[in-house]
């Protein structure tokens, strides 16, 4: 057998054996409290490395089980949560997270573990329309952490409606009364995942020097109708949506200039208090109740007002690296989606790993653990490795995957 053929045969056989081992590890036996031991972790690292290099196509499932946990203490330990601040810098700069979710519990649980730090605080808003099973699972998870809580008021969230913005604001209001001295609030959805460690996020936000991060511009042509016409939320058990009417809206209050931007932002505590109390913010919220996707104009419009705490100048544009998103209409720029599109946004597949790893953004959107498990697993492993490498304290054995 020629050497080149022999080499190809050996590589092929090895690949098949590794795949079988992975399959058995993934689906064999009771998966409650399944965790990566040393050999599993090494195996996953090798698989991820190969996949990023475009050499392998593996299926991997390392399910983080939340249900039927015997105790919070055991769950926190066996799920490898980090239970102590890793540096004084992070202690001195706690973060607040707003997490608005409605389904896909496993993906949310991975996000929560990835961003969890004991010095931070977490407000979780569960869609009022979510199933009882989902609500119960989230409540059970959150109850294990003294620095996490459910929003005091839950909204039945409608895609594109005011309820989505109101869900964020409900958490912002709850967080404003927290004794945790958080510096910035970051809003997320259940299909986000961090690309940077907590320390890296802290250092990035410290660099803003109190400025709020609300990427956005003056409305392009396709977005003008969102605030020009009256919109109505339609809410039912079968289908919820926003409809556009032919009625024109009055001008915005206080002669505000409306901007169009990202629904995902990083807000200083001072700005959060302004949003809750200042008449301009309160009136803009009321005016926005019958617009389309008000979360995409509310934050950026307020943050362009001169003199507002942490405001950015009108020409700030899309400044900031909050979210890595692959839009369907921008394939020429990002190279295409290797998963599939939903609402014009890529659900990341395994082939997107290299692009995600190269991104300078703090977070990426969107992920589905049950559809593309390896994508989340590889990012999670890489993030934990960097997190522990940056630690300035002794690392507990349970923090390793």
From Swiss-Prot:
Localization of this protein: Golgi apparatus membrane
Transmembrane segments: 8-28
EC number, as in UniProt: 2.4.1.150
Stretches assigned to the Cytoplasmic side: 1-7
Pfam families, alphabetized: Branch
Top-level EC class as recorded in UniProt: transferase
One GO BP: positive regulation of cell population proliferation
Membrane topology, from the record: Single-pass type II membrane protein
GO-annotated molecular function: acetylglucosaminyltransferase activity; N-acetyllactosaminide beta-1,6-N-acetylglucosaminyltransferase activity
GO CC aspect terms: Golgi membrane
Reactions mediated catalytically: a beta-D-Gal-(1->4)-beta-D-GlcNAc-(1->3)-beta-D-Gal-(1->4)-beta-D-GlcNAc derivative + UDP-N-acetyl-alpha-D-glucosamine = a beta-D-Gal-(1->4)-beta-D-GlcNAc-(1->3)-[beta-D-GlcNAc-(1->6)]-beta-D-Gal-(1->4)-N-acetyl-beta-D-glucosaminyl derivative + UDP + H(+)
Keyword entries, A-Z: Glycoprotein, Glycosyltransferase, Golgi apparatus, Membrane, Signal-anchor, Transferase, Transmembrane, Transmembrane helix
Segments on the Lumenal face: 29-401
Pathway the protein takes part in: Protein modification; protein glycosylation
Chief location of this protein within or outside the cell: Golgi
Origin superkingdom: Eukaryota
Residues annotated as glycosylated: 37, 255, 315, 389
Record function comment: Branching enzyme that converts linear into branched poly-N-acetyllactosaminoglycans. Introduces the blood group I antigen during embryonic development. It is closely associated with the development and maturation of erythroid cells.
Family: Belongs to the glycosyltransferase 14 family.
Protein name, UniProt field: N-acetyllactosaminide beta-1,6-N-acetylglucosaminyl-transferase
């Amino acid at each position: 057998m020629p050497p080149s053929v022999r080499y190809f045969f050996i590589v092929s056989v090895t690949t098949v054996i590794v795949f079988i081992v992975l399959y058995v590890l993934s689906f064999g036996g009771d998966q409650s409290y399944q965790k990566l031991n040393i050999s599993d972790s090494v195996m996953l690292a090798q698989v991820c490395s190969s996949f990023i290099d475009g050499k392998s196509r593996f299926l991997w499932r390392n399910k983080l089980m939340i249900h039927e946990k015997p105790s919070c203490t055991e769950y926190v330990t066996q799920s490898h949560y980090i239970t102590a601040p890793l540096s004084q810098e992070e202690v001195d700069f706690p973060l607040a997270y707003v997490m608005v979710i409605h389904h896909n519990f496993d993906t949310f649980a991975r996000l929560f573990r990835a961003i969890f730090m004991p010095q931070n605080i977490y407000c979780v808003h569960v869609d009022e329309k979510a199933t009882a099973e989902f609500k119960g699972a989230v409540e059970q998870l959150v109850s294990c952490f003294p620095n996490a809580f459910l929003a005091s008021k839950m909204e039945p969230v409608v895609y594109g409606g005011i309820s989505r913005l109101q869900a964020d604001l409900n958490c912002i209001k709850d967080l404003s009364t927290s004794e945790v001295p958080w510096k910035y609030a970051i809003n997320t959805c259940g299909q986000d995942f961090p690309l940077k460690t907590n320390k890296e996020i802290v250092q990035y936000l410290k660099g803003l020097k109190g400025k709020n991060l609300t990427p956005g511009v003056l409305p392009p042509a396709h977005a003008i109708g969102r605030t020009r016409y009256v919109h109505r939320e339609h809410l039912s058990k079968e289908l919820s949506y926003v409809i556009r009417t032919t009625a024109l809206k009055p001008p915005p209050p206080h002669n505000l200039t409306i901007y169009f931007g990202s629904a995902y932002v990083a807000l200083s505590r001072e700005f959060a208090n302004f949003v809750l109390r200042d008449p301009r913010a309160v009136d803009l919220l009321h005016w926005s109740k019958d617009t389309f996707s008000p979360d995409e104009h509310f934050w950026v419009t307020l943050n362009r007002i001169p003199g507002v705490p942490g405001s950015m100048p009108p020409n700030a544009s899309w400044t900031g690296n909050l979210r890595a998103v692959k839009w369907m209409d921008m394939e020429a720029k990002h190279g295409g989606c290797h998963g599939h599109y939903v609402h014009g946004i890529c659900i990341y597949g395994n082939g997107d790993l290299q692009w995600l790893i190269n991104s300078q953004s703090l977070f990426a959107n969107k992920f589905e653990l049950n559809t593309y498990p390896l994508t989340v697993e590889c990012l999670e492993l890489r993030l934990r490795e960097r997190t522990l490498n940056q630690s300035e304290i002794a690392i507990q054995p349970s923090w390793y995957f």
